[in-house]
Amino acid sequence: PLHEARIGGGFNTVDYFQTEGRFTHYNLFGGARRLDITASVGNLGASALNGAGIFRRVEADTTTTGDAADFLKPTWQASIELRQPAWLQRPRNALSIGAFAQRRAVPAVVIDRGYGGNLTYTRTLALRAPASLSYRFEVTRVEAGGPYFCVSFGVCDTLTIGALRSRQRLSPVLAQVQIDRSDQPLAPTRGYTARAELEHASAVTVSDYRYNRAYAEGALYARLGGKNSVLATHLRLGFVRPLGGSANLNAEVLHPRKRFYAGGSQSVRGYGENQLGPRILTLPAQYLVNSVTASGAPCDATSDAVRYCNPNFITDSAKNPVGDDKFTPRALGGTSLIEASVEYRFPIPILKNLGGALFIDGGAVGEKVLDPLGAGVKTLADLVRGTGAITPGFGVRYYSSVGPIRVDLGFNPSRAEDLAVVTEVIKNGRREIIPLDIPKRYSAMGSGGGVGGFLNRFTLHLSIGQAY
């Protein structure tokens, strides 16, 4: 057919419910020109399902950002693209032009709106091995993530953060090459896939955010122990470096979307989405009213002096200790990423279309580590220290006609760690983020022991498709 329309939906433990629609015209104006119109909406039902059952919880954080409700609002994307095959009368060439608008979220990190256009030249090097060069012009505005700017760049007053949240241009040039030599698209049993990207944004590309970014990933599949038993391995590497700010940004600020994050259903599965790597904690100042300073003096939680409060010794009005659950962890991401996984997939003989999996995921996120893009090269030990983890786990797959429906349980062996804490005060009639001088000894697993404490170390992931 010359026309095709599709509509679908689904859910997972991070994005709640989603729906998507697509319309394709395969011969627009003749010459096999292809027009694609797509739209998707996610985060549906988030307010009602927040923290219910298998779904992730967005904490009701009332500190500076006040953005807990923002993370529960729907996300959406819409795009239109026209693709010209055999461009310049070369059968391996294609040129596409498109426009888009979106409200995207990096879960628990940042929300941003954007709109713009893109131009892409694609050259097919071999079967299932395309290379492309693209330019994407986007006007973006960060909606949430005040603590990100405060801790990462020292910008803590809400007036300056407001300026950073104004519309900025994010306009990179991206070169990409990929190859697919796997035997099946949805559940490979043999072969390999690989992808590499180089990205640059600067004044030359008319971008306010300026950086160099490199990323590569690959997966290898081999049958082991039987026809439907597969050993799958996966590796991800990434580096990004800011190049300085424009007149609008006036700082070496990376867009949060261009930093690297780890943790989640397709990453290190012992952690929730983006929760492995550098993090901070946010805490409403009201919980610091009954705190003390490092010297034991009463804490002043209403002024700049709140920075001297000790977040490890706080109580409520009834003098009961305030637990770790009152602190909200927020991922900062990093400029360097290394991640590796090994997974053994096997059939369950007595249950048709059902399979099991055993896996080990490892990853680390850091700053300027093993840096091929700039100065400040550090060691692998620096990358792993404090920001890395290895998490084992197991899972079940139901092999449906639309792909594997996957349930994974990842075990988190991490212990308590020292994390920076930020809160907010009203200063001269304006809200201001204040980083505390004393870090918090924090454990996302809680302080409980026994069976309950052990079970708290498991992270559940439910999604469609293999992890890689």
Region spans (language model):
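C-terminal outer-membrane beta-barrel translocator/porin domains of Gram-negative envelope proteins
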Residues: 3-24, 42-45, 52-54, 133-388, ...
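Transmembrane beta-barrel wall of Gram-negative outer-membrane proteins
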Residues: 63-167
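Predominantly transmembrane beta-strands of Gram-negative outer membrane beta-barrel pores used
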Residues: 6-11, 18-87, 93-101, 118-120
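Secondary-structure transition/capping motifs at alpha-helix termini
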Residues: 2-3, 27-33, 86-93, 125-129, ...
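Short, solvent-exposed loop/turn segments at the edges of secondary structure
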Residues: 2, 14-16, 32, 75, ...
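Residues at secondary-structure transition points
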Residues: 36, 270, 276, 399-401, ...
